[in-house]
Amino acid sequence: MSLDQRLQTTSLTIRADERVVLLGASGAGKTTLIKLCNGSLQPSRGALQWRGQPLKRLPRHERRSIGTFWQDLRLVEELSVIQNINSGALGRHGLIWALRNLLGVLEKDACLAVMQEVHLNPSLLKRAVTELSGGQRQRVALARLLRQSPELVLADEPLSALDPVIASDVLDTLLSLPGCLISLHRPDLIHRFERVLGLRNGALVLDAAPDMISKTQLEWLYGRS
């Protein structure tokens, strides 16, 4: 995978079944890398591939195997909880299904199942997302991701500004999925992952297992030495 001008050109391979954490100081290029991996940003050179195929040419049903947990959540404010959760399944259905989702309740049992997984009260099923607390909104976004059933999850700073209980639930849910690439400002959590990538000034400078990384390396990665 060749990256764009905000990152130094490199090659990086991530398996769909890996749990990878991405570390680096603010401005190191973490968000850019996440956006490149989900196709919302195109590289200025080279190409991104998923399962050996160019990412930008994949049909919708193939692209849904990559899910993104957005830092700003990207909930549809005009829709209810169940409608937002069901939007995670759009990649498996056509236009008629999408229109029916806008008009009423579809696949209620499937939605209740993922709500239970993220500890979201079922009484909120038909509630407008504008009426929810910040923590409840986080859980709706997580439930939507579970409805998508992705093979690889991308997440950019998903734990920022969360209280410890919600942050723990969010990370547990993301790590329960088949594979993930998650950017964090939490070096203390690297033991939860199989592989650590480190960016500094747009360059990939670290790629190792957590138990192979020293405190000195982490301090250098964040510009503290």
Positions of predicted regions on the chain:
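Conserved ABC ATPase "signature" region
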Residues: 98-123
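Conserved beta-strand-loop-alpha-helix hinge in the C-terminal portion
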Residues: 203-225
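Helix-to-loop junction immediately C-terminal to a conserved catalytic motif
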Residues: 38
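ABC ATPase NBD coupling module
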Residues: 53-70, 104, 213
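Catalytic Walker B motif of ABC-type/P-loop ATPase nucleotide-binding domains
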Residues: 153-157
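Conserved ABC ATPase signature
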Residues: 128-132, 136
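Hydrophobic anchor residue at the start of the ABC signature
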Residues: 142
